Amino acid sequence: MTNWLMSDGVRCMSRRGARLLMAIGCACGLACLLAGCGMIGLSGEKASWSQVTLTASDDMNNNSPLAVDVVLVSDDAMLARLAELPASKWFAGRADLLSTFPKSLRYRSWELVPGQRVDLSDDAFTGPRVVAAFVFANYPDPGAHRVRIQKFNGRLVVQLDSNSFSVADTK
């Protein structure tokens, strides 16, 4: 690369050097734009379970029907709110939460009877990326009755027992 000295003592670079500098600037700008994508709503991942199974034991909820919700959370503020919310408060306030924060969460609901099994297909939870997912079960006994789902792929199995439930994810 040849530098040229101008009459006022300022050095200027050759066309090749200028093109190199411009290419470096464009590459840095592109890197900044791509890094910004995570900041404008591309965080999280898609809920892509191959199957979701809800299984109620014969003595579930003291032999009574039970409401169950799978909740998908799209932002960190809603995640913080739901992470501490017991199921009783979720079921009492879910309509208000959804109407106030329609882009922050979505959910699917079922009411199962003892001994029932529900198999859901892989398209039951399609939609925007999520940062977290929870299962809430509306048992009448005190307690959180909330489980955070750790994986967003494979099979999801929710086992509902007499007064508690568990969530297992398998490949």
Which role fits each region the language model picked out?
Residues 36-37:
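N-terminal Sec signal peptide cleavage junction
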Residues 4-28:
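Bacterial N-terminal signal peptides that target proteins for export
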Residues 118-140, 146:
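Helix-rich interaction surfaces within compact, conserved domain-sized segments
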Residues 46-54:
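Contiguous beta-strand segments within globular domains
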